A protein has these predicted regions:
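Helical hinge/lid and interdomain linker segments adjacent to catalytic or ligand-binding clefts
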Residues: 1-48
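Short, solvent-exposed loop/turn segments at secondary-structure junctions
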Residues: 3, 37-39, 111-112, 125-126, ...
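Short amphipathic alpha-helical segments and helix-helix/interface helices
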Residues: 13-21, 94, 146, 150
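Loop/turn elements at helix/coil->beta-strand transitions in domains of secreted/extracellular proteins
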Residues: 25-30, 102, 122-125, 156
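A recurrent domain-boundary module in secreted/ectodomain proteins
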Residues: 129-156
């Protein structure tokens, strides 16, 4: 993998980090989800500072127990596909992300209780998932989770 490919697929390029920082500092709310939002941003001090200072999460490793596809949060248990298959977008090693500052955990992988998602409420709000939102298997669960996220963003 050459440097240009790695830069092209970077979760948050330097330019994107500046835009997101400015957006959040002006009171914007942001939802981030993906299998590599922690691991991809853990390589340099600058990237770690961005995720911790702006998005309010840190990286704690990847979930390696392939037998677990359950995630608990928002009062329910949801499932994501972990093993490659022909029907779903599989997530073999989703990221375990932890809250920093006054952020708090909102989802945990089960079993094991590693943090799968965090939320932050300050002058702006973040909601970050260590797995892709679109990988939630049940359409009903996706709708309920999204309603919860939007409710968090709009509550006074």
């Amino acid at each position: 993998e050459d440097a240009s490919t790695k830069a092209y697929y970077k979760t948050f390029s330097s330019a994107m980090q500046r835009i997101i920082s400015s957006y959040c500092q002006s009171g914007g709310n942001i939802l981030v989800s993906g299998a590599y939002v922690g691991s991809d941003m853990n390589g340099t001090q600058g990237n770690r500072e961005f995720t911790q200072r702006v998005l309010k999460y840190g990286y704690q490793g990847s979930l390696t127990d392939k037998n677990s596809n359950r995630i608990n949060g928002l009062g329910r248990t949801i499932s994501i596909p972990r093993l490659p298959n022909e029907n779903n977008y599989a997530i073999p090693a989703p990221d375990c992300i932890v809250p920093v500052d006054s952020a708090f955990p909102v989802f945990t992988y089960a079993p094991g209780n590693q943090s799968a998602g965090i939320a932050y409420k300050g002058n702006y709000r973040t909601f970050v998932l260590g797995f892709p939102f679109e990988s939630i298997l049940s359409e009903a669960d996706r709708a309920i989770v999204m309603a919860g996220i939007l409710g968090f963003f709009t509550q006074k």
